[in-house]
């Protein structure tokens, strides 16, 4: 069986797809809006 190779880095994840990064531009705000509309518990990472 193969190993799980994805480690995941908290800082990188926040910088790429955190809430404040999403709010910076129009498309990011659209993502937040659509997730709010859908009723997601977590809007961003």
Curated annotation (Swiss-Prot):
Signal peptide: none annotated. GO terms for molecular function: structural constituent of ribosome. One of its GO terms (cellular component) is ribosome. Gene3D superfamilies: 1.10.287.3980. Keywords: Ribonucleoprotein, Ribosomal protein. The keyword Ribosomal protein applies. GO terms for biological process: translation. InterPro entries: Ribosomal_bL34 (IPR000271), Ribosomal_bL34_CS (IPR020939). It comes from the Bacteria. The keyword Transport does not apply. Belongs to the bacterial ribosomal protein bL34 family. This is Large ribosomal subunit protein bL34. It comes from Prochlorococcus marinus (strain MIT 9313). The lineage of its organism: Bacteria, Bacillati, Cyanobacteriota, Cyanophyceae, Synechococcales.
